[in-house]
Amino acid sequence: IIYLVYLLQFLHISNRVTLTAGTVGPFLLVWIWKRRSKIPGVIEWVLENVERLLSGERGKKTSLVQLRGTIYRRFFRGKRKQWLNVLLELAVMGAAIAAITYVYGPNMIEAYGYKASDIPVHNYWINELDRNNIWVAGVYPYGFHIVIYYLHMVFGIKTYVLLRIFGVVQTYFVYLAMVVALKMVCKGRFTPYLGVLFYVMDIFNRNTYARFEGALPQEFSMIFILTSVCMAIRFFQEFAKEQKAEENEKKELDQNCRWYLIQFAIGFSLTLTIHFYSTMIAGLFCIGVAVGFCFRFARWKYFRRIMATGILSVLLSVDRKS
């Protein structure tokens, strides 16, 4: 989305039609290309069922019963234990979401304000994107502004409304990133959620979390700090497995390693694209990962891939600012 908005802004053709087409078009083309041999049969099946429904050959109740049966067979039959496990985890996650909403959400109801003095400036910059006037006040990391502008332009939500409620939404994702990171280092199934519940408790210095009540670029970029670090850790773990794996397993493990590196590059570049302070934090985490895996990091086969990915992530973010 960020690259798409940058491209359309530079061409001065950014609007709801071009943004929607640029978002849906590539996925639709890929979907059609992959399923091009099955599409005629699917269209014929849909038209046949619609015709039978409209002609009265098949009643509405019969169609609904068949649809319900299809959904049951695909998602529920023989999966009772799986759903029980999922529901238990969803209940714990729901408690965490409720706690986050209780701590960070009252602003939406009680004050309905911006909660930070610099948000009106960001609001002005986002409004200028409506006029295809990017970087109206100089070059600045515009990742956050582009996301708000995209939501405003495509879905028709007023910018000032988004800036008043988006702070809680982005905080959900920050904590979700924390859950993912804790799942990597904790053996207990519910320990990550307990860690989130402990952190969200209102027992710390208010200055440590007050800014999360507002929609701010620096806090938004924190979503990508832990995610990029997690991908770096997973690369080292997966690459070690690849070196010891059988030949028939190496190809799949190598693809996993490449995918982790790509995600690391994207995550790290997004921190710089959104706010450079978060890049400093992510850099410190990366140094910690390098120290933790120092014996592997120092080997050329690890080092060259990590360095190439790091340079690529910086170039991706710099390219967005050039």
State each model region's role:
Residues 136-159:
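Short hydrophobic/aromatic helix or loop-helix immediately within or flanking a transmembrane segment
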Residues 21-34, 91-101, 313-318:
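Hydrophobic core of alpha-helical transmembrane segments in multi-pass integral membrane proteins
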Residues 7, 32-46, 74, 232-262, ...:
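Membrane-interface junctions at the ends of membrane-embedded or membrane-associated helices
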Residues 2-5, 93-103, 144, 153, ...:
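Membrane-embedded helix bundles of polyisoprenyl
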Residues 1-83:
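Membrane-embedded, hydrophobic transmembrane alpha-helices
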Residues 321-322:
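Conserved small/polar residues in nucleotide/adenosyl-binding loops
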Residues 13-21, 78-88, 254-259, 297-312:
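Membrane-interfacial entry segments at the cytosolic side of transmembrane helices
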Residues 98-134, 234:
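Extracytoplasmic loop-helix module adjacent to an early transmembrane segment
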